[in-house]
Amino acid sequence: MNEPEIIKQIIDECKTIAVVGLSSNSFRPSNGVANFMLKKGYKVIPVNPNETEVFGIKAVAHLSDITEKVDLVDIFRRSAEAGSVVDEAIEIGAKAVWLQEGVIDNAAAKRAEDAGLLVVMDRCWLKDFMKYGAETRA
């Protein structure tokens, strides 16, 4: 978990990203990160029961509502809520989970790793993209 090789692999290979907690409020970190993902060519699926659409993309309430294959589940939720999201990510067959900076759930991370998912925890996807992925998705 959190090894540079795993971070690079996720950035390079995970093209369809479900962003859990994505807000339409442009002042929220989830909005800025997801907007950047879109500009870099990633497909973003907003997951938030309080939103109908974000960036003109229809939002879904739960990961289980997504009808296509999800590569990465990027979690912008409180640490206490991350475990159930990780369990959903495992259930839908995601390749990886990313618990954003400040989101920590060691037990959930272990469950994901045990299920074969790549895991990054307590790191910012955007910062890591700038460090590890800028040359691959410019």
Predicted feature residues:
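Structural/interface elements that position substrates and couple domains in central-metabolism enzymes
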Residues: N2-V70, D74-R77, G83-A138
